[in-house]
Amino acid sequence: MDAIRKVYQYAEPNLSLVGWMGFIGFPIYYIVWEFMFPQPYENLPLRILCSVLFFGIIYRNRTPFEWRGFLPAYYQVVTTLCLPCFFFYMLLMNNWSNVWVMSFMSAIFLHILLVHITSVMFVQTFVGIGLATFFAWVAQGFHLELTMDWTHVPIFLFIYLFGNLFYFRNQVEHEAKVSIAKSFGAGIAHEMRNPLSGLLTSIDVIQSVLPNPKEGKKEQYTLSDEDVTLLREVSSDAMKIIHSGNETIDLLLTSIDENRVSRSTFKKHSAQSVVESAIESFSYKRSTDRFAISLDVRSEFDFLGSDTLLKYVMYNLFKNAFHHRSSEDFHIHVTMYSDEFANQIVVTDNGSGIAPEVLQSIFQDFYTTGKSGNYGLGLPFCKKVMRSFGGDIRCQSEVGEWSQFTMTFPTIGSSAVKEIKSELTKLKTILFVSEQNILVSKVTDIARFMRFELTVLDVPAVLKNKEYEFEFDLILIDMESLDASGSHIDKVESLLSFTEARIVYMFEHHPIQRARSVSFEPIWVETQAWLLNTRATIDRLLYDANYVVPSMPAKPLDSTNKRTIMVVDDNESLRKFTAMLLEKQGFEVIQTEDGLQAINALNENNVDLILMDIEMPVMDGVEASRQIRGSNKAYASVPIIAHTGDSSPITLDKIGSSGMSDFIVKPADKNRLFDKIANWI
């Protein structure tokens, strides 16, 4: 019965079309084969019966609720009677004429498409052919002469066997992808508990430091220097948790379609730093659990991969170890080794161990021991991660004594890492902004050798681009090609506020002192040094995670002349927090929930800038912007910055066509938000 239900659910999206095709097709083809191209035998009552059966499929959504449970079985009856049964019956009654041989072949193709489970389809075929033979025997006076052409039988068998074989293979692949997607979806939901738990703890700490108004309201409250320092540290940690959570979602979602881990964000990391961070940031159920983990670094090493993914591998191993602890004297020992051939991280615990029959299956997809709470991405995901790094993970265990997981990483100079970097480099995009021929020639030669995608633009061409057209992995800007006055630099920097690329300023004598604060901090590279070692420098800029510069503190916006900003967003929390952030900078803030409220508020208030969400109920941001721009009122020219979480080309086209002035992608840190606002008011 479960197979019958699955067949019906699979076909359901197309059933209305199938129903109309059968309802209209059966009587129409009676006219075709009876009058236009007469055949030896036709049967109008039988065709009307099939047409009525298909009408039941059209009418299925209007049937009484208590009858709908029988719809899957009804669908099987209809397909059996109206496809193999009807067409084989007509084939027999027409003495295997060519018209009905071709018609029966068409019915086979349609049958395979409508019934995707092979066993059900073959049962229907045998039942249908059996009924057709019986009815033909009865119709011919309990006598049936088989004048069949046996040369047609191999063709029918070929269609049935290979049609089902190919269709079954595609169906298995489709179901595997769906299962993987479900597994990753459930895993993401579970694994996000770690950063959410961290945020919850951060909020608890903040609330414990802040004065409680219920204990007595005051006009002013005083915080000690220690409390202020603690709040700063906690908020900084919370921002790191949010960044890590966003990166994790992005990394895991890219793995769903391909059943493998995406390598697009791989960089060189210190294994010791990542492991230490994983130990400190793991969500322990008990405070004493932290002391159960020890780290022994016998030799440090770097690896090419994702620090976030390695942390989640460590989280999984810790979680499984704690879940299978067997005594109060439980401990987890992490050891790091390194030699000239390979690097290893070994995680050993003295828990309940793993049985030999289970040990063979723990890295297989969708495997679970069945113990409550044993969910998440699990060990199969750990295997995928380690293989994406060019390494592997294996397990040894003794039941009741210990378990040991050994993660092996290739060395940075190994052929495996070089191959991964070579494949990744082909997918990298680099923008080079320069008007010096020697530099352009050099980077062009390197691009051919390293095989990355290179775009070379002069300054006027850069200034013609939109912000969203700077989606590169690396942007190299020759400062000597920009004018000395700084006007070009300001314009270029304003265009780069949206990009996630690593931005490099190349200088010949000394870095230029910049008075203007921007939302990014560039990396300064001496041009001569870059020319002497171009390939190594580009390789380091693309893959060295430690090649970073500290972020600059946010520069307060100039609010001497108090300006008014309208924040339009249906997300109450985001709207309120954005308003608080702007009010701290000295702005007047008006909050509205949708585009219609925003237009009504504009009729009553003078607004200098609108920060507008896109997806909102009642009236979305795009439509609201069109109405604002189309009005003949004073606010028609007010700057509108789209505040959206969707940066797809379709959304950006909508933003541009609506008359919005600019856009910023959620989540945006305050530096980027302030810099964007400063460009317009």
Curated annotation (Swiss-Prot):
Gene name of this polypeptide: cqsS
EC number: 2.7.13.3, 3.1.3.-
UniProt GO cellular component terms: plasma membrane
GO molecular function: ATP binding; phosphoprotein phosphatase activity; phosphorelay sensor kinase activity
Short name of any one Pfam family annotated for the protein: Response_reg
Protein transport among keywords: no
Main location as per UniProt: membrane
Domain Histidine kinase residue range list: 187-413
Lineage: Bacteria, Pseudomonadati, Pseudomonadota, Gammaproteobacteria, Vibrionales
Membrane topology summary: Multi-pass membrane protein
Subcellular localization(s) per the UniProt record: Cell membrane
Positions bearing Phosphohistidine: 190
PANTHER family, A to Z: HYBRID SIGNAL TRANSDUCTION HISTIDINE KINASE C (PTHR43547:SF2), TWO-COMPONENT HISTIDINE KINASE (PTHR43547)
Domain Response regulatory residues, every copy: 564-681
Name listed for the protein in its UniProt record: CAI-1 autoinducer sensor kinase/phosphatase CqsS
Organism (species): Vibrio campbellii (strain ATCC BAA-1116)
Residues bearing PTM 4-aspartylphosphate: 613
Function: Senses the quorum-sensing autoinducer CAI-1 ((S)-3-hydroxytridecan-4-one) which probably functions as an intragenus signal. The sensory signal is then relayed to LuxU and LuxO.
Bilayer-spanning residue ranges: 17-37, 73-93, 112-132, 148-168
Membrane listed as a keyword: yes
Keywords: ATP-binding, Cell membrane, Hydrolase, Kinase, Membrane, Nucleotide-binding, Phosphoprotein, Protein phosphatase, Transferase, Transmembrane, Transmembrane helix
Catalysis: reaction(s): ATP + protein L-histidine = ADP + protein N-phospho-L-histidine
